[in-house]
Amino acid sequence: MSVISTKLVTSPKQATSSNQTTSTKQVIQTWRTELKTQQNVLEATFLANKNTQQLLKNHTTLIDKLLQKIWLQANIDGAVCLLAVGGYGRGELFPYSDIDLLILLPSQHDYVLNQQVEALIGLLWDIGLNVGHSVRTQEECIGEASSDVTVQTNLLESRLLAGSKTHYLQFIKAMDALMQPIAFFVAKFKEQDNRHAKFNDTAYSLEPNIKESPGGLRDLHMILWLAGSQKLGKNWVELAKNNIITDAELRQIKRHERNLQTLRIRLHYLAKRCEDRLLFDFQNELAIDLGYETTHRKRASEQLMQSYYRSVKYISLINEILLKTLEFTLSKIAPIIVHINARFEARNSLLSAKTARTLQHYPSAILECFLLLQQHPELTGMSASLLRELQRVKKLVNRDFRDSAENKALFLKILSEKNGVNHSLRRMNNYGILGQYIPAFCKIVGQMQHDLFHVYTVDEHILNVLANLRRFAKPELKHEFPLCSQLFAAFEKPHLLYIAAIFHDIAKGRGGDHSSLGTVDAKRFCKLHGLPKNDTHLVAWLVEAHLKMSSTAQKMDLSDPAVIEQFAQFVKTERRLTALYLLTVADIRGTSPAVWNAWKARLLESLFYATKRVLNDETFSVQQTITLRQQKAAEKLAKYGLQAKSYQALWDNVGTAYFVRFESDEIAWQSRLLTPHVYADKPIVRARLSPSGDGIQVMIYTRDQDDLFARICNFFDRMAYSIVQAKIYTTINDYALNSFTILDQSGKSVSYSGLLRFIEAELSEKILATTPIETPLSGRVSRQVKHMPFATQVNLRAEASTNRHTLELITADRPGLLAKVAFIFLQLNIDLHNAKINTLGNRAEDGFLISAKNNHLLNPAQIDALSAHLNLL
């Protein structure tokens, strides 16, 4: 039964018959109120019965009847047509979508008609309709459609709402004559490519667009437009009747289309606007509305998004299959067939099976077809028939299939090929084969990670890591990462790195330590595939340790020889070091475009080289490191005409520990600047562009004071600079010698020479100031942080040998975070001895070495107060 009331279609004339003095404004308000009432009824009905198709149909009918009544009362020339076009013409009117209309004028029309049409459009807006309209003659429509495929597409789905049926049929006939299916196909295919490129060719972003993203509703519309242009059907049922899609595909398409339509409807109602992006603001509420519940393993929103990603994955697949099918139907030329082997051939550069049951009869051919694409670069992909056959037989990839020696050899061969490894595995994932072959992989397909720094699903991230490893193998890309390319070229058995990449995050979402759980899966895989013990041990170790190098580089003091020695003892061999370095770089770069930067690259490279030196030098010692750094610094200082006697006083005052904390380049730079100022009365602040090529390095030398760190952090925070490294050091003569590396957060273009002078002058003034420190700024947190709460973790460990505590703070990053932490230290009378700042996207993982005053351990009351303050950040 329709929920549409007959009240809404009462005409203005009827509404005013009982009272001739009713104003036009009152009539408009009446119509507006009735429209809103009926739209509210539609919303309530949908939320009660959750019938997506009924909502779209009834909303379309509601607007149809309203427009028809208004048109009738407007008394417009009978030769004029009112047409529904676009999504409205298709009969899919979402709650807050534009109502796309075409007012089709006769070739000859006068000023009066133009005025009537203009008044009509104004009335539609006045009563609350979001109208997207065009007013054209038939000739103008043809001209626009000839030059703009978007206009032509919009008119494909036109419906006559009111006006001359004869005129409309003439218009349809003219538009049909204009259609050139081949040209239309080429234009739409290019349009889809461009649209996908706007979303970085991935459907798996954190906040996808339900309508426009790859795998979204627009990819389904694309199929219907192209089929319609060839007169093969205007809807899915017609396509099935015309054998363009199978009955099984019909059911799957309808299921996944309905899933996205339901999400889009609910999103409109939640946002109370035409919002097609699955923003963080709505994901939690949408998930709850749809009945998802948070578990100890997955948030409700993660389950919602996994359902969404699996739908868009299927839609992307069926889009590929049907576009190839429709392209084939357009071809008037016999295909060029090239023999490949007994099972496969190339048809117009697409891999095809020689018989319809090839994969059924020879299951190993399921993997073979991916291998052939690697071995035959002239092939551009798989034919529609082969893709369909893959979907039909993929359940054959079962335990018996995985136990087959032939199939195991084929999979290892895919990983060992020189070309196409990334493309093959990505295709295997897109077509549902990779998850069948590696069951653990199936569980993480479409699984989002709300950890504030991964911006892709787990499966997409894994494939990104693999793609990054493959980039190291390409000589034409060696300029991107010269060291990685050099190491990769010399690394035997690179397929071991690919296996480690596949398994490094495969246990995400299971609960527990994903590295340990993934190691079990990796060992099982290696054993099943007959890898030698040494190779198996390497892969398993890489999966278990894949976070270690990143954590060490970003959280530990790499200038401390003890840190390097400890890491060297952990990796044990240069082969392991090389493998872990390559995997780590690929992993970090695969998490998010925002996470990787030159600073992180320099940290990892420094750790690699330092560890390699230790592994190759059995006589390594801390004293050896100190001596070497002093020698290198002295060589640099000699180039400036400085002899040892000139800076010896400075070196005596900084103490031996200084040469452990700072690298030779920093020692030389600081010595050159501070030699005349060993007992300076005023702060010495010097800034330079970081030698790593990313950020600014700032040195502060001044008499130590309790609020020094807080003042410095506050200053950089108000400059909108983020601190990526802080080295805090106190000399024997009680001077603070601190070094900060900062990065610009604003992205503004600046004059660096002026900026460096500004920092030197203004920071000196801030340090000398006797006024209280300004309260840290409360910057706006990102929407992701706001809507995906991340519990702050405070880990405090006593170092009894040094009377200090190691503090690890893991929390959502935000502007002013470090300034607030410094302010807390000041309030609680806590001394800071070192800081390691690590930002991963929207997540901060910072480390601090702290103590109470006079170098004592914190007492229980201070520990409780510190934890309480930090948890309130």
Regions found by a protein language model. Name each.
Residues 129-132, 142-143, 397-408, 470, ...:
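Conserved catalytic alpha/beta cores of large enzymes that bind or transform nucleotide phosphates
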Residues 136-147, 542-551, 742:
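Short, conserved secondary-structure transition motifs
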Residues 259-262, 285, 292, 299-351, ...:
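Regulatory modules associated with amino-acid/nitrogen control
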Residues 110, 174-185, 206, 210-215, ...:
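Hydrophobic alpha-helical scaffolding
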Residues 1-13, 17-84, 91-93, 99-454, ...:
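Non-catalytic interface/linker regions that flank or bridge core catalytic/transmembrane domains
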